[in-house]
Amino acid sequence: MTTETRSLYSQLPAIDRLLRDSSFLSLRDTYGHTRVVELLRQMLDEAREVIRDSQTLPAWCENWAQEVDARLTKEAQSALRPVINLTGTVLHTNLGRALQAEAAVEAVMKAMRSPVTLEYDLDDAGRGHRDRALAQLLCRITGAEDACIVNNNAAAVLLMLAATASGKEVVVSRGELVEIGGAFRIPDVMRQAGCTLHEVGTTNRTHANDYRQAVNENTALLMKVHTSNYSIQGFTKAIDEAELVALGKELDVPVVTDLGSGSLVDLSQYGLPKEPMPQELIAAGVSLVSFSGDKLLGGPQAGIIVGKKEMIARLQSHPLKRALRADKMTLAALEATLRLYLHPEALSEKLPTLRLLTRSAEVIQIQAQRLQAPLAAHYGAEFAVQVMPCLSQIGSGSLPVDRLPSAALTFTPHDGRGSHLESLAARWRELPVPVIGRIYDGRLWLDLRCLEDEQRFLEMLLK
């Protein structure tokens, strides 16, 4: 060991001496004596390693308390941090999909703070069913006979198949064998449910006779899967649920549909592309319809199944139902969200998902122009800050080919170096409330469709 190395080691402080320093008193109060000591020991080991490898002290050795505070502050941050979503994707799967309505947030808080009548019947003091209140709401909205709630739509499809078709065949069009994010594939779900997939037709064309020829004594279901995350165009043919239900009645085989996104209102009345609705399929005679709670419906993550009472009863009594059931927070949020649909005239104001999807390009353009000046003043030395038209997308596999006209603030480096964009995006991800945009075509784009809190946005970006 050289004299210089010994000198560096000698500059490392003892933990007892550090703890006596006044700057560590508040740290010990905030994070606890044990955790502070653990971290100091870890940092001393790191410092010794740096001395050994580089013959120098880490820069933070000049202020141990500041480094401890920084590390413990970062450590204490929640894994689920609020962010400002300016990606241009409204229902961003990686950012949690639908924002919850205030009514849903309040309902969850009440359910968390107090015992609730989750499975308790106040009328006779007996045991109730956790799905009952929501089933009544869903039946009122969709016209179904009964309903069942589980923790997501993948679970809903699994339960639907396992309870009604295990050990038997399910007939599906080849063009509807979808895969969604995370490699979730309909054929794989069928295998897990104990069903045999009987695919019919071709990728682009399936006829009623294809289903008819596939039905045999082992057929349990005719199944439709809404291709919500892709579109086949051109020379195509598919039969709708009403036609398939008529065929199913003739052959005595029930029809079920995995609707995926599941909008409970006609989106075309808001100027958005129309999506098939559960109530339309129920009216057509479909026996079971499954859909998501946290996509176009705008509620919490949940899988919802509506349909005929006898079929729902089979789902409720299946062992998988208990494994897949929703908890009280999910049910509280979903009930509050569904109640908003009872007053459709106020839905676009009170339901955040619909409010964001229906923001006009003109309103967003005005917002972008309002924000451009302070951001240009702050970032103008390095970047050209401009207002640009752009196209938002709905996200989460909903309406995959449709885009919503919007406006963005774009940041273009004066020197044209892409590394500056990466650096800027990384800086914004390190903010107390990270700002998430997207890099495309030599610019960093901030699509303002989902920006409602301008003050917080400016507080972050003007730091």
Curated annotation (Swiss-Prot):
N6-(pyridoxal phosphate)lysine modified-residue sites: 295
Which segments of the protein form a coiled coil according to its record?
Answer: none
Question: Which GO molecular-function terms appear in the entry?
Answer: L-seryl-tRNA(Sec) selenium transferase activity
InterPro entries registered for this protein in UniProt: PyrdxlP-dep_Trfase, PyrdxlP-dep_Trfase_major, SelA-like, SelA_trans, SelA_trans_N_dom
Alphabetical GO CC annotations of the entry are: cytoplasm
From the UniProt record, give the pathway where this protein acts.
Aminoacyl-tRNA biosynthesis; selenocysteinyl-tRNA(Sec) biosynthesis; selenocysteinyl-tRNA(Sec) from L-seryl-tRNA(Sec) (bacterial route): step 1/1
NCBIfam families reported in the protein's UniProt record: selA
Q: Which family does it belong to?
A: Belongs to the SelA family.
Q: What is this protein called?
A: L-seryl-tRNA(Sec) selenium transferase
The species is: Escherichia coli O81 (strain ED1a)
Gene transcribed to yield this protein? selA
